Every structure is written in structure tokens, then in C-alpha cells.
Regions:
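Extended catalytic cores of very large enzyme megasubunits
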Residues: 1-301
Length: 302
């Protein structure tokens, strides 16, 4: 209990935690029962709190009690949860251990963030732009959470940028920003960050996206990303040659929105659910060939 009080006095835990933490009942049997590897993970993985001098400040059973009381809040329920944890019937996710009773309590492990086709809400009020997502991502990563993004709304490489009379660099270039963001944050020194990036198969930059982690590039950029391709029924039917035609149309999401007032990602199968404006069609590709490339890319980068 004295250790908990010292952590509160140091500002590492919330003052209101004192009542719940003061009811701590040590479980030395639990502390001693953990294997060497488990204790190594507990300490080196920063599941235990550390003081201002970065020294370990709690035992495994102390950490379990801290988590149990932060989650349950009501004492009897906390005792039951504590019993389950110390019996290893329940093992809470990492953010519980990192953040329970701290000033930035955040228990969720996974988040998804929208990335709209604009740089900042400063110039585009009411929209959730690239650098807005980047800022929120940094906060989530700092607290130990992982983040997923769909980059399908970003205009393709080479498309016009009317505000600057320039051309767009495409989704993959912006993904490098998010990748570097994780390296800088390092999840608050707790663990390596985790990110998922996705792109719809109809996006004109789909080949560049799926090859960003394959071949000679697989050990270079986007080391903090897993990537995945969203496919729809139309694409799979083309890939399987259902109607004898394997050609699949690519869509510029910016032009699609300009012409329809809707986001292409709102549709499960945009080709079947709406009439794609001809101006939004940015070429076509062989679905059967691309499906093979996607499968090979998954193997090559895995």
C-alpha cells in the first residue's frame, strides 16, 4: 500500500485511486508462480509501473489489483476480478496494465480512424483530414493502442490538387508519414506500435499499395504497417471469370465524390450498387492477374 501511495504522490496514479488500492491483499503465491519468461515479459514489457527514476514500482499481484480495481471500481467485484487474474483465468489486454488508474486511462487495444482527402481541418472545418488522423494516432499510440486506417478516400498519385495547382502524391506517400509517426512515438516507451492500412481494390493506386511491402521494398518502408486490400463481389467475379470478362474498372474517389456527392467507400460493392460516373473511371485492370499479385504479395511479405 505504501508503494501505491508513493506512486500517487509522484503523480503517476490518480489521487482517487487511494481508497481502492489501499484494500490491496498481496498474493505472493501468484508472484512466485510466474515463470521466468512471464516475469521477464512483465518487467521488460513495461506491464508494471515504474517510478520517476524508471525503477520497478510494483509486483505482478500489485499490478493485477491495480487493474482489477480500475476496471470493476466496486470492491467486491474487484476482488472477484483480481482472483480471476491471479488464477490466470483472465489476462487483460496490454493497455489495461499500462494505463489502469493513471491520469490517461485508456483500455481499448484497437482503434480505427477515418482519413479524408484533405490535409487539415484547419483549412477544411468539419472534416477529418490526414493530419488530424495523424495527431489522434500519435495520442493513441502513446497510450499503447493500435490503429487501423482506410486510405481509399485519398486521391490517386498524379491527380490534380486544385488548391495548389499541383498534383497529388497518393495514399502510399502519406502512409509513410503514419509509419514514421509510430517510430517517433514508440508507444510511450511501452512497446512497438501496430498499424493496419487498407485500400479498396478499385483505387487507381492499388498496385503501388500492394507492392509497398513486397520484393526489394519489404524490409524498407512501412515497417510499422500491416496492409490489406478490400475486395468486393464484382472484383471476385471478374477474377474468377464468371461472365468471361476479367476487366475491372478503377475509380478515382475524388471525382466520384464530386460527381455523386457520395463517398465510394460507403458502398459494399460500388460497381453493383451505383452507376459509376464515366469521369470517375480511371482505367481498368485484369482482375484475375491482380488477384494473383495480391496472393503473391501476401506470401512474399509474410
Amino acid at each position: 500500500v505504501a508503494r501505491f501511495k508513493s506512486l500517487i504522490e509522484a503523480g503517476l496514479l490518480k489521487p482517487e485511486a487511494i481508497e481502492a488500492l489501499s484494500a490491496f491483499e498481496p498474493r505472493p503465491d501468484f508472484d512466485r508462480s510466474l515463470s521466468y519468461n512471464a516475469l521477464k515479459l512483465f518487467t521488460n514489457g513495461n506491464y508494471a509501473l515504474r517510478d520517476q527514476n524508471f525503477r520497478l514500482a510494483e509486483t505482478p499481484s500489485m499490478a493485477a489489483w491495480r487493474v482489477a480495481t480500475a476496471v470493476a471500481r466496486e470492491l467486491e467485484r474487484a476482488k472477484l476480478y483480481y482472483a480471476y487474474i491471479t488464477q490466470l483465468k483472465i489476462v487483460p489486454a496490454s493497455p489495461f496494465w499500462f494505463n489502469a488508474w493513471t491520469r490517461k486511462e485508456m483500455f481499448a487495444s484497437c482503434f480505427t480512424l477515418e482519413v479524408e482527402d484533405c490535409l487539415s481541418s484547419i483549412t477544411h472545418p468539419g472534416r477529418y483530414c490526414i493530419y488530424d488522423a495523424l495527431a489522434y494516432s500519435g495520442i493513441i499510440q502513446q497510450l499503447g493502442g493500435g490503429v487501423g486506417y482506410d486510405f481509399s478516400l485519398l486521391r490517386p498519385e498524379g491527380d490534380v490538387v486544385r488548391g495548389s495547382v499541383g498534383v497529388a502524391s497518393g495514399p502510399v506517400s502519406f502512409m509513410r508519414l503514419f509509419d514514421a509517426n509510430v517510430d517517433v512515438i514508440k508507444q510511450g516507451g511501452k512497446r512497438r506500435g501496430a498499424q493496419m492500412g487498407t485500400l479498396h481494390v478499385w483505387h487507381p493506386d492499388i498496385r503501388k499499395f500492394m507492392k509497398a511491402k513486397t520484393g526489394e521494398l519489404k524490409d524498407a518502408p512501412l515497417q510499422n504497417f500491416n496492409i490489406a486490400v478490400f475486395v468486393d463481389d464484382t472484383f471476385m467475379e471478374k477474377a474468377l471469370g464468371v461472365d468471361g470478362d476479367s476487366k475491372y474498372k478503377l475509380i478515382n474517389p475524388r471525382v466520384f465524390y464530386d460527381k455523386t456527392g457520395k463517398k465510394a467507400v460507403e458502398f459494399v460493392d460500388v460497381h453493383k450498387e451505383t452507376q459509376v460516373p464515366k469521369e470517375a473511371v480511371w482505367g481498368e485492370l485484369d482482375a484475375r492477374q491482380l488477384f494473383g499479385e495480391i496472393a503473391h504479395g501476401a506470401w512474399d511479405s509474410g
